Structures are given as C-alpha cells and as structure tokens.
UniProtKB/Swiss-Prot annotation:
Organism classification: Eukaryota, Metazoa, Ecdysozoa, Arthropoda, Chelicerata
Species annotation: Oxyopes takobius (Lynx spider)
InterPro entries, per the entry: Antimicrobial_3 (IPR012522)
UniProt feature coiled coil, ranges: none
GO MF assignments: toxin activity
Official protein name in the record: M-oxotoxin-Ot2d
C-alpha cells in the first residue's frame, strides 16, 4: 500500500545520499593529494 511506496522513496533517497557521500569522499582525497604535491 502507501507504506511500501513511502519506503521505496526513502530507500532511493538513501541511495542518492550514499552516492553523494562517496563522490564527496573521493573529491576530498583528490584535493588533498593535489595539496600534498
């Protein structure tokens, strides 16, 4: 019913946040490497 739709939306949002977190982590390590060189 409604709850399954809601949980699906929450899950997709969580996936997006996880992806953004990964990208930001990679971005941060890349910029740190640039600073060290």
């Amino acid at each position: 019913g409604k709850f399954s739709v809601f949980s699906k939306i929450l899950r997709s949002i969580a996936k997006v946040f996880k992806g953004v977190g990964k990208v930001r982590k990679q971005f941060k390590t890349a910029s740190d490497l640039d600073k060290n060189q």
